[in-house]
Structures are given as C-alpha cells and as structure tokens.
Amino acid sequence: MEFNQEVKKATDPIYQKISKVMPEIEWLIHAPYIYKINKLKKEKNAVILAHNYQTPEIYHGIADFSADSLALAVEASKTSADIILMAGVHFMAETAKLMSPNKKVLLPDMDAGCSLSSSITGKDVRLLKEKYPGVPVVSYVNTSADVKAETDVCCTSANAVKIVKSLNVKKVIFLPDDYLAKYVASQTDVEIISWKGICIVHDQFNENEINNIRKNNPGIKIIAHPECPPEVIKASDFAGSTSGMINYVKDNQPKKVMMVTECSMSDNIQVENPNVEFIRPCNICPHMKKITLPKILDCLENETGEIIMDQETISKARLSVEKMVAIGR
C-alpha cells in the first residue's frame, strides 16, 4: 500500500502522538492501513474494540475504544454500530457476541487464542460441579462461551475480589487461572477451589527478575498483573488489572515504572505519560500479536472471521457475563 500525501495528512496527528514509541520507517508501513481502515469502518458503521495489549498502531491508530476485558464487554453491549471488530483474542470476540447477539462480531484471526481459555472446557466445569455440588462457580472472563454457560458469574482481574466477596459464601470454584485464584484467596476469607490454568505471558516473570530490576533502578515502582505468580505480586508495589495499572501510572506519575505484564502496555501508556520512564523487561503475548493491521483490513473488507454461536449457548453464557457487568468494578 502506498504512503501518499492524502494518507500523510489524515494520519499525521496519530503519528505525532506515538512517534516516541515508533520509528518513522515503521510508521510509513502502518499509515496506509490505518488510513484505509478508519475510512472503511465509517462506511460500514463498524466499531473497533481493542484490548490494552494491542500494539500502538492499533491501540492509538484505529481503535474506537481501548480497554481491559471488563470495559470491552460493557462497550460491546452499548454500541450502536452494525459491526463489532474485536482487536483482541477469541474469548473477547465471543464475549462481545454474548453482549450484542444481534450484531455482526468479527475477529481478524480466528487462531488468536488464550492459554487460560484453552486450559478448561465446559465438560470440565460440569465435572467440578458434580464433585462440589452447590458451590458457586466464578469463571474468569478469559474462558470460552461453553465454560461461561456453566458458570454462575464471570469476573475479570479488575473485579475478581469484589465478585467473590459479593457472593457471601464460604467456598467458591474459581476458574481457570490458578495465580488469580491465589490472589483472590489472599484478599478474602473465602475458600477457593481452583484450576491449574496459567497465562503464558505472566507465568514467565519471577521474583529474582523483579528484585534485580529494583536493585538496578532505585526508586522504581513495580506494578504487576494478578495473573503473575504470587511471589512476583508480593515483590511488587501494586497489583491490578490492565486498567488498574494504567490508572496507577496516570494518578501517581512515578519517575520510573516497570509494568509486569505484556510488552505493548508500556508503549501504549508511555504515549499518554511522557514524563514517566518505563523500564521494559516484559513478555509478548503470541496470541494478541496475531492481530495485525493487514488482517484487520482484510477482515473488515470481506467481513470474515464472524463469531457464530447457537442461541442456547448465548442465552446461558450471557447471564454470567451480565451478572459480572452488573456488579462492576
């Protein structure tokens, strides 16, 4: 695709915003796609929802709304667009379909999965419910629609503790993230029956890495995602969802910060917090990185990658997500 004066004029304001985190030579490749996608989504009355782990050219260049999983679910339920294109992974697109079943929901790469989502099935949940009758099931939103259909209430990392406390019970089944389950257990008096799922991004971090970063960067603030191992969270200054991490940086404006999460977060947030120095030992999510501008353009042009679900699954799974949204953060 050609970078011409028309493209330059339309996309220059975006590049001025992200130039500190993107070389010009890279921008010249992205800009024509951004121009065409932004034009096409208006023609088709499409909205692009992007997760916080998307790369800057997507997050700042074409997304109409960028957020964590909880806010994306809420936004999907409110949009007046005819088409929802999810710049995220498969379970996020499914959740958007649950919240707007009459909309056309598209995912640019149907293989953009999630290690947490693939760690458990609806059948697994049914077996757990048989083993622990009467114990409510709380499922992380990072799960398939089949799992959500067997769930009492969903949660995200932003509201997991609040959701569990709201049930007013002594015991819950919490699926599928084992580390998030341990984090919730540390913040409540509820007995947690967990699953052995992990996020391949956050599982790679370790306590020694955190301590070395702190040693070499006096005064640094280290903020971690609750999907990290417990010892990493303990060694950090703050633990929170992606939105919680963004708000921490925005509100506290630390001189130096390390975000113990996916790599693109630091790039995206630095754009809006130029006075903060981001120390970047981070890990890449291979699933999120399957979403690219060329794939988004192709998906939007041809309306491929549509999320299709049967009505029974939608009806059952939607209830658990609606309960989560109603409880909020």
Feature-to-residue mapping (PLM):
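Active-site loop-to-helix "anion-binding N-cap" substructures in soluble metabolic enzymes
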Residues: 2-259, 265-329
